[in-house]
């Protein structure tokens, strides 16, 4: 199932400039999602990270992965209207710099769910298939 920006915004509350997914290419509600993010020089973080040598901040790559995980878990009918918040970020590993012009494939598989908590195994790869970042993300689902 493919989701564009409009469908993504119906599931998660993030908006510009903090919506870090361009589209979802694969979705199994409650199980996994695969999304993509094209990195462009015009993004606001590159004004200061780093002037003359722009590099995508690792925390924003983690956030993009969490947004994909949130789409996966919040796409379940019983989670409609909830928001996913970080519970924890474990075993984060940053392996490749991500630069303007790169395209990230963002994958998150929900490996455990218990009540309002979901744990996702998340990996972002570049166009060459090299892992840029991986982490285990715990998301807490809350009505706000």
Go through each PLM region and give its residues.
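Active-site helix/loop of acyl-thioester processing domains in fatty-acid/polyketide metabolism
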Residues: 24, 56-79
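Short aromatic-glycine motifs in intrinsically disordered, low-complexity regions
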Residues: 5-15
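Hydrophobic beta-strand-centered segment that forms part of the acyl-chain substrate-binding groove
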Residues: 1-2, 69-105, 132, 136
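Beta-strand-rich interaction surfaces with strong enrichment in secreted/lumenal proteins
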Residues: 9, 52, 94-96
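Catalytic strand-loop segment that frames the active site of acyl-thioester-processing enzymes
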Residues: 16-56
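Conserved small/polar residues in nucleotide/adenosyl-binding loops
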Residues: 142-144
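Short beta-strand edge segments in extracellular beta-sheet folds
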Residues: 138-140
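Hydrophobic beta-sheet segments that form the core/acyl-binding groove
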Residues: 24, 90-127
